[in-house]
């Protein structure tokens, strides 16, 4: 919404060149009343933006007022702004030193969600300033009437009007410039948070050049000195950063060397029990030689027993070394447990195989059969054990009968001796 909607122009006929409002009168009044009661919601602001018509504002008209042959106040202000720059006038009008902090607090906000609320606050501030400037408008009307009585000056020279229309005068009568259609365009300095002090100082520098014959040199020298000091400070900071990086790298290298030294000390302090661990892994697995002759049976069994005894000794040594050795990590302990379990499992299988061989040798029918399966050996050994138990009971009965017969014979012999 343009800032001069509530203040129609009265001095010149530029009203027909103004861009028509984007909304209808009822909708505009509705949004005005709602914004005065409470700030609009973000969703309402967004949809209100999307309802705008895609028509750009018209360029401001350059023709003078029809009521007088002399250039009007707006034309004179346009010439002033062309010479001095329109940004300086807008910034000096909007961004004064008193309201600079207020403008920063209002305008520099989120443009997506709080744009319309900030614009409403800004419009309120501008309307208050325009109301204050209307009071001073009557005073400036006398000076502008004197300027209208004189012939128009060239745009290359500043229209001073005997010193009455200076930079302050442009600030005083800038409300008339805002009524120009070009004021509908938004000033970039209002939307974007540029440093305001720099822009104002840069805008006021041409006026100082006009008043003075020679430009000041102290500002340039001071700025060059400040730039040199900043460069020196940057160099010092870079050097400090490089030194800090070097210190960090040295510390990293020292920590790495310390880790290497600690690892070497720990490896040297650990006792070397690797051959014992290898012995556990290299337990001999003996298979029965089915092609061997029955004559080598006794020697084979004796050699197996000797090797089993040696394996038992090795396991005892491993257990003793574990008790004496320092505690290791969890991975090494798990590996040791797995290896000992494998060794014990192999030993159990070997003992079971030897027991099968011994049982087979006790069965007379399968004694010479080297390829007898384990199931047959177990079955025949059970039958043989049962038969041996029956033989034992039979022999016990026979011995009892023989003892009874012996007792009977002794009694008969005693009777014969007594009869003689």
UniProtKB/Swiss-Prot annotation:
The keyword DNA-binding applies. Residues 336-388 form the bHLH domain. It comes from the Eukaryota. Keywords: Activator, DNA-binding, Nucleus, Transcription, Transcription regulation. Pfam families: HLH (PF00010), Myc-LZ (PF02344), Myc_N (PF01056). One of its GO terms (molecular function) is protein dimerization activity. One of its GO terms (cellular component) is nucleus. This is Transcriptional regulator Myc-B. It comes from Xenopus laevis.
